[in-house]
Amino acid sequence: MLGSAPAMNVSSITNNPVWAILFWVSFYSWFFVFETWVSMRDVRAKTTIDNTDGYSALFFWAMLYTGIFLAFAFAFLAPAFRIDSDSLNSLLFTSGIILIWVGILFRLWSIQTLGKYFRTVVLIQDDHKLITSGPYRYLRHPSYTGSMISVLGVGLALGNWMGLLFILSTVCIGYRWRIHVEEIALKKRFGSAYTAYAEKTWNLILFVW
């Protein structure tokens, strides 16, 4: 029965079927609907490319799936790490749902700004240009920032500190390698222009990295 909301039994606040529906709609909208659309853009693209991905996409997805699995496992199977305070859990849950959608919109903005140059694998196109407008004015990899915001939202909404730690840690490891590979490819393509651009921008998080 929907009223029992067993799948979201991570705290008292998430036993509410309205909260359960809100979480699952948000999670599926991000992880399955939106990210499937992002992947389909690559399938439709027909551009001569220099693929320098080096399996970084595969590594990232492996880390993301691992993080999501651990986050849900801790949320459902490790009550010792659950947030017992209803008021705090309510705040974190609400913040988490908001962040999932903020991340989706920020990633969408980044993808639309990059246009045809956005791909889910690291590659250089024949007519590749350095985009420095929109979110790329301040961040070199803002689409990843959007994903991180959504990941943070999922972790907060699940209401388990250990799950939050693991999902953030694994995704950070995945993006750390991905960005390393991508930076090498972009520096090779754009040379000093990219070096100058990198000196006045951040990788993923403003004022942090």
Mark where each language-model region is.
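Active-site-proximal inter-transmembrane loops
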Residues: 121-147
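Membrane-anchoring alpha-helices and their flanking helix-loop junctions
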Residues: 1-125, 152-209
